[in-house]
Amino acid sequence: FGLAFAVALPLFAQQKPAYLDAAKPIEERVEDALKRLTIEEKVAMLHAQSKFSSPGVPRLGIPEFWMTDGPHGIRPEVLWDEWDQAGWTNDSCVAFPALTCLAATWNPDMSMLYGKSIGEEARYRNKTVLLGPGVNIYRTPLNGRNFEYMGEDPYLASRMVVPYVQGVQQNGVAACVKHYALNNQEINRHTTNVIVDDRALYEIYLPAFKAAVQEGKTWSIMGAYN
């Protein structure tokens, strides 16, 4: 029996799909999973099944994933397909200071602790993705969401976003850096045609996203609305 068990172990290891093998590079795992998905399954995973969730693929052991707002607090539970709160009597969350306050500290260690703390709460609530942090640069003072972002300085935002992302993802929760890119106002945000020259784009509006991806290793990015 012992010999048969010893032989079976390497056979099982060989049969284990690459996408389930945590020891393999993420690129290889993703490619392997994509090859196994049907068109219908791919479309379903890219489409929401509720306000804050998308379906998984049970036959491949891929779970559905659940998202929650940040960037400065976990959103209380909402109804399945509505924005109204679900009204759970035991539902509460920590309201963290806005990211503009965090950025004003110029303290990367504080940013790491902030991200770690909010990531812990997201994990406790069984969330897969935290919809934050936001790093859109302050272009106009009339943007009502400026308080959600890390200031008007691309260097400051670049230094503060990295530890935030790392702190969140220490908990196995994906940070979703937003909104890529040039989503710097809320007025007519679904129809605005943003015109920007290359120098402004690469020196002002993209550095924080670049740092989040290359240094912070963020697991997801949210597209802009413009």
PLM features: what roles do these ranges have?
Residues 13-226:
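Glycoside hydrolase catalytic-domain context in secreted enzymes
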Residues 1-10:
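Bacterial N-terminal signal peptides
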